[in-house]
């Protein structure tokens, strides 16, 4: 229920472009560094190194030691996306894929702001959005669900080193709604089930 903070929605579009930044920020998907480094116009990486890092890092430092001014993300401008409908399309797609969630839509707002504001103003906007989300009902509910799921997987008083049992078959007594649902869960997991109605 949150957006990336600490300037993430403002810096990433500056170093990777709007389309890539939108995809990463709204989905949270990992992208291999080699793929990002090969993207045209990317400024996230100065250099990727295969093999021994130390000699390559020293050589790189020597190469740029005399360069002034050093490039700064602060000075990079964000080009508006080539597709003028990119932000509207992203919002429409998120309305379908992340139905009812506020944060992904607000991510799009922040990335769009990066194309219109300087870095400081963009970070201020991002901070306001983040603060509005972190105290909101949806973020609180999602945090509650997150911790609830983890708590549900931990049974009190059962030692962590308790060996797992291999379940080979299951019997469910009661073929009502609940029994049918339990039966389907086991069948979907490939475990044979005997369903008994008493």
Go through the PLM ranges and name each one.
Residues 149, 162-198:
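Phosphate-binding active sites in nucleotide-utilizing proteins
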